């Protein structure tokens, strides 16, 4: 019989802050055996792949099922710090036997958990619609833990925190509601449902290093907890985040970290761009800093820039003791990178909690609103960012292969996740080998564990400018995407093919504003000759340059809703290319946009 000793406390100081109402529990580990009876022998590790605990909340038993987050670190994960003489020291530690878990509550469909088990249980879980936090009490010779709700934590600073991204929005959010009526094609559904991967790099500035008393172990544990929560949040969007590197600026900052968040973001973006150029490895990067940004701002990121060479970055103020608060900000800024705007007043689908893309932050958030999900899907279908579809290359892997992390590595034939998560009929989840008689596990050219016949269509035509791809009969993967020659007419002569797409002004307006929109009248585009406000052709070092008269439809995009006469445009102060007419767009008969100029087809194709 399980024995627990809960009691109520009035006030206590925990690692996460002052808590004025809490319950003390003594989590008991629950032995777990598969239905067959005896477990297969596993390599000796400090932390088990799966664990179960039981404790009581408000007198009711709660049993979290926890599974090690095997995809938390990439196989070529590195850690970098700097010696006292400024020398860069980079190591490739073995971090696969870690103590960071995700999971669910037994017998609860809509539940979740993100827990670290490094030194007791610390994290949060959702139980019966409420979010609870658990944390060890650090009492000598005691397994006591505190459980509390968010509203029981005394605020360090009651001022609502905000994101630094500001931009114009359409005069109503009606178009975003209408997007829910769109019906996706089978090809679009396959793309949206495909697993997506973000290779993630975290830099910690010198202020944060000094704030945590130059203790790299404490900093690493905090970052790991943050990324574990981030993973739990983004799994709902079918994204898997792999930490590929952690860099601690232990000697001095590598970028210009200022209270002006925009200056810091720009400086960090340039640093990342140089680092990517040196390593030829693409990733999304965030800078964690202890500097106090101006006003109530705690983060900033570029919108829709996840795969951008220059803008796939964000800066985050480590403003709270509570990892849940900082992780919510990290998720918010990564959401911007994934093309998601701030929520509008009508976007309420996160229960009693605030949604992640809320404009103000006073409490932790763990879910995206339905508006955010629609905007994210629209960004994916419009921009088709390729960097998120690529698993890390086997040739990049340095550390030993880990079966069960969804990454097919050296020595593996497949990897469908843990035995509990695996849904493949072709892959043995315990060994990461194909089952007897199977040729493949997944891929557009794999069906019922066999290669599809040569000539079978594996990628349908997406539009006028695309060409179908067919299986070879020798591989599970669909051949490289090919498309019609640039410059050929498309969509009833409304546009010209450009890199497999048919970019038109109308399609771009629909992509930004939803259905029932049109391109604005020509007089709106003459604003691009002003070189200020919403009208310009290019921006450099903050200065806006006007369009020549013949190039006005290659600058800012202007759209209208129904019979509106307003000249609508969309801008982002952090991405000068946001809301601009796309390259290759038809700007007249026989002419297209190239480098913000309207030029003849023959010159560019």
Swiss-Prot record:
Coiled-coil residues are none
Instruction: Give the range the annotation lists for the signal sequence.
Output: 1-11
* Active site, renumbered: 333
Q: Which InterPro entries match?
A: ADAM_Cys-rich (IPR006586), Disintegrin_CS (IPR018358), Disintegrin_dom (IPR001762), Disintegrin_dom_sf (IPR036436), MetalloPept_cat_dom_sf (IPR024079), Peptidase_M12B (IPR001590), Peptidase_M12B_N (IPR002870), Reprolysin_adamalysin (IPR034027)
Give the protein's cofactors. Zn(2+)
At the top level, the lineage of the source is Eukaryota
What is this protein's name?
Zinc metalloproteinase-disintegrin-like BfMP
Please tell me the species this chain comes from.
Answer: Bungarus fasciatus
